[in-house]
Amino acid sequence: MQVEETSIEEIQTKIKRLNSKAGQMKMDLHDLAEGLPTDYTQLMDVAAATYEIYRQLDELKQELKKLENAK
């Protein structure tokens, strides 16, 4: 049971960090989109990085839900 608690806490900490990073990436993507066509060459890289952060966040949230339901 102690192992599960630690895992849940670790995942919650990772989710908090990723949420913060994801919010910043979302704002960066928004700022880049507002400035189009200037810096359009960066669009795909920023979009891909933003997608990856949100994919990781979704994965962690699903893992957390499984651990919480297993209690």
Swiss-Prot record:
Transmembrane region positions? none
Query: What protein name does the entry list?
Result: UPF0437 protein asl1434
Tell me the first and last residues of the signal peptide.
Answer: none
The UniProt record lists the keyword Iron: no
Q: Which UniProt keywords apply?
A: Nitrogen fixation
Specify the domain of life of the species encoding this protein.
Bacteria
Origin species, per record, is Nostoc sp. (strain PCC 7120 / SAG 25.82 / UTEX 2576)
GO BP: nitrogen fixation
Family of the protein in this entry: Belongs to the UPF0437 family.
Would the keyword Transmembrane helix turn up in this protein's UniProt record?
no
